[in-house]
Amino acid sequence: MRKYELLYIIRPSVDEEAKKALIERFNNVITENGGTVEKTTDMGKRRFAYEINKMREGHYVLLNIVAEPKAILETERLMKISDDVVRQMTTKDER
């Protein structure tokens, strides 16, 4: 198993309950595929450096994950399908 950092941005128009449900949903996808979420950090609403899809800000969420690559691929696939996720990026944690 490898360590990963997954950062994703949720649309600013999503209310607090829906945001929590979305975070929980993606955490469950990782655990259902044999991974573990070590830490979930809600970084709050932040302004973008440039406009993305006519939006100027979004809710940033950072996940520290230990998982197999298949769990990461499935999570990324679901994030790309979701209209509530503006952007996502996964990096291998080398620490």
Swiss-Prot record:
Q: Which InterPro entries does the entry link to?
A: Ribosomal_bS6, Ribosomal_bS6_sf, Ribosomal_S6_plastid/chlpt, Transl_elong_EF1B/ribsomal_bS6
Question: What is the role of this chain?
Answer: Binds together with bS18 to 16S ribosomal RNA.
Decide whether keyword Ribosomal protein is in the record: yes
What NCBIfam families does its record include?
S6
Q: Which Gene3D superfamilies match?
A: 3.30.70.60
Return the Pfam families for the record.
Ribosomal_S6 (PF01250)
Q: Which organism is it from?
A: Exiguobacterium sp. (strain ATCC BAA-1283 / AT1b)
* One GO location term (cellular component): ribosome
Keyword terms of this UniProt record: Ribonucleoprotein, Ribosomal protein, RNA-binding, rRNA-binding
Could you tell me which SUPFAM superfamilies the record lists for this protein?
Ribosomal protein S6 (SSF54995)
Gene Ontology biological process: translation
- Family to which the UniProt record says this protein belongs: Belongs to the bacterial ribosomal protein bS6 family.
Q: Name one GO molecular function term.
A: small ribosomal subunit rRNA binding
Protein name per Swiss-Prot or TrEMBL: Small ribosomal subunit protein bS6
Question: Does the keyword field hold RNA-binding?
Answer: yes
